[in-house]
UniProtKB/Swiss-Prot annotation:
Functional note: Solute-binding protein that binds D-mannuronate and D-taluronate (in vitro). Probably part of a tripartite ATP-independent periplasmic (TRAP) transport system that mediates solute transport into the cytoplasm.
Residues where alpha-D-taluronate binds: E75, N97, R153, R173, Y196, N213, E214, R240
Major localization class: periplasm
Highest taxon in the source lineage: Bacteria
Assigned protein family: Belongs to the bacterial solute-binding protein 7 family.
Record protein name field: Solute-binding protein NAS141_03721
Annotated compartments: Periplasm
InterPro entries cross-referenced by the UniProt entry: DctP_fam, TRAP_DctP, TRAP_DctP_sf
Length: 330
């Protein structure tokens, strides 16, 4: 029996029960959440904040049952569960895991989408992404109630990469989505989609000269041992939607729906501040320990101009050209 089938059988009954209500005001609502991480991770802390805010704002009885450390599967499982309205009611997801339902949603992960943290926060605090939210709800029956994230991805390399001469032909690992390689090819680098668990050895043996990542992952997996030079390209700032099953959301009383949306927005703002702050702290810890040398790229504005044609073509391909322009204009 597959993990998905077994899990669905075990918990679908509980999930259905969580979304059935009596006509009395005293009826208790039970909502089950899922996190891939432990209590110390920023995403889990954000979900806990969401729960806390709902408890504070809602006069009725709501019980939360948040399962941690991947107990209910991985994110791809969560997407299926949310779509079907079984097993879980709320979680945090990477946009890429929802692409099979909503083709334009990976725009959130496109490199150089955001000019800086202020632009990123302005977009996520507005209704600019409403078309993506509508698409996801219509096609996947998954409702976005807030946005967290905040980890900033930069270049990490054996030797310093601070000029376009350094970047030209630079052999680097990128994530598997084609847009990732296309962006760095436009910047004259030589990207390849090496498996993440092979990156350390690939740098150590000279197969690649570097890669790109967030400070937390660099620190946790000690990538600084083989690539001690970090260049502040700030090419990606993480966006992670806080989501709820549409079936669950629609089953809630109207006053609880309003509270969920308010709590999701506030929890998202909390999570963004938390993760972006932790990102800076972890980076500084590695600098203070002498593990990393940090440099600014000499002309990041030119990077933004060089990648625009690639971004435009990608947005057109996934039907998100108007959305891309709206993000840029924010």
């Amino acid at each position: 029996m597959s993990f998905f089938t077994k899990t669905a059988q075990l918990v679908s009954g509980a999930a259905v029960a969580a979304t059935l209500f009596t006509a009395t005001a005293q009826a208790e609502t039970v909502l089950r959440g899922a996190s891939m991480f432990d209590e110390e991770h920023a995403f889990t802390k954000t979900l806990r904040k969401f729960e806390e805010l709902v408890d504070e704002k809602y006069d009725g009885d709501v019980t939360f049952d948040l399962r941690l450390n991947g107990e209910l599967g991985v994110e791809s499982d969560y997407v299926t569960f949310l779509n079907q309205g079984v097993a879980i009611d709320y979680t945090i997801l990477a946009p890429s895991n929802m692409a099979k339902f909503a083709p334009s949603i990976p725009l959130m992960d496109m490199p150089f989408l955001f000019r800086d943290l202020d632009h990123w926060n302005a977009v996520l605090s507005s209704d600019v992404l409403a078309p993506l939210e509508d698409e996801l709800l219509e096609k996947a029956d998954i409702k976005i109630v807030g946005y967290t994230g905040g980890g900033t991805r930069n270049l990490l390399s054996k030797q310093p990469v601070v000029t376009f001469d350094d970047l030209k032909g630079h052999k680097m690992r990128v994530m598997g989505a084609p847009i990732q390689a296309q962006i760095f090819q436009a910047l004259t680098a030589a990207p390849s989609a090496i498996a993440y668990n092979e990156v350390y050895n690939a740098i150590q043996t000279g197969v690649i000269a570097g890669f790109e990542n967030e400070a937390a992952s660099i620190q946790n997996l000690k990538f600084y041992e083989v690539a001690p030079n970090l260049t502040l390209t700030r090419h990606s700032i993480t966006v992670r939607p806080i989501v709820m099953s549409g079936k669950t959301f629609n089953s809630l009383p109207a006053d609880l729906q309003a509270v969920v949306l308010e709590a999701g927005e506030e929890a998202g703002a909390y999570g963004r501040e938390l993760e972006s702050r932790e990102d800076g702290v972890k980076l500084q810890e590695m600098v203070d320990a002498g593990q990393l040398t940090v440099s600014e790229f000499e002309n990041r504005d030119k990077m933004l101009e060089m990648v625009k044609p690639v971004q435009d073509a990608y947005a057109a391909e996934i039907g998100a050209s108007d959305l891309l322009e709206a993000v840029r204009a924010k």
